[in-house]
Amino acid sequence: MPQAHRLTLPTLPVKRQLENKLIWNGARSVEKANFFTIGYTGRTTKELITTLTANGVRTLVDIRQNPISMYRPELSKTNLARLIEEHGMIYAHFPQLGVPRDIRAKAIESGTRDVIWEWYDQHVIAPFLGRNLHYFLNCVEHPVALMCTEIDPQECHRHRLSLALEHMGMTGFDL
């Protein structure tokens, strides 16, 4: 299958992604966080659950627009929701916080995620802060973890949400 159909961008080696994650979290504190972000790549479902429960997460907010994993069916919406609920947490899917396929395709064509960030800030963050932040803060049990796929939060749209929430006075940490 041609790369454009898989909708992937060049990805850094896992070691570098983990280093970037440490840099991202450098000025943040897990103890002071009132929300979390998390990527599931490179984790077993057991590791995902252990990380969430160890940090007191009450609600996992899935911010993938299309919550299906072809490679890891246990992380598709129905299976993941069941797993999360079996461990006493709440699963919530917020597809409006995801990135549409056509925007990801444009990023691939350009070879940079900047296309995603620009689109996301304009079409998701601005309305989210303007209309949906109150709903988001009051419709789920806290603390929440915003979940997507990537290890490095800076390679994922969840970092844009994190920056927006931090701009509003909240404190985040990537698990």
Question: What residue spans do the PLM features occupy?
Answer:
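Residues lining hydrophobic/aromatic ligand-binding pockets adjacent to catalytic sites
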Residues: 13-175
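Low-complexity, intrinsically disordered or signal/transmembrane-proximal segments
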Residues: 3-5, 17
